Amino acid sequence: MSTPKAPTGHFTLLYFASATSFTRKQHDFFAAPLLLAKLYNAIEEKYPGMRAKVLESSALTVNLDYVDVDEEVQKGDKGLVIQAGDEVAIIPPVSSG
């Protein structure tokens, strides 16, 4: 299944596994540009409780590249900016056995 193209001026946020269960969606669109350091606040505003239950234990990719969210938060206004048309994904922990 393909993800619909983000509307003009927005980026796509993809959800997988527990993130999909929490949001009951496979994707969302958020207005761009947005500092990556502010992304978790934007998600938490839309889905209260998601930071503690999903985001704090998940990885994040921007255009298929893994990003260190803590490092980006420390950079503040000089950190990575998510641009219109970008694809961001929340990757919850994967277990194997």
Name what the model sees in each region:
Residues 1-96:
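Ubiquitin-like/PB1-type beta-grasp interaction modules and other compact soluble beta-rich domains
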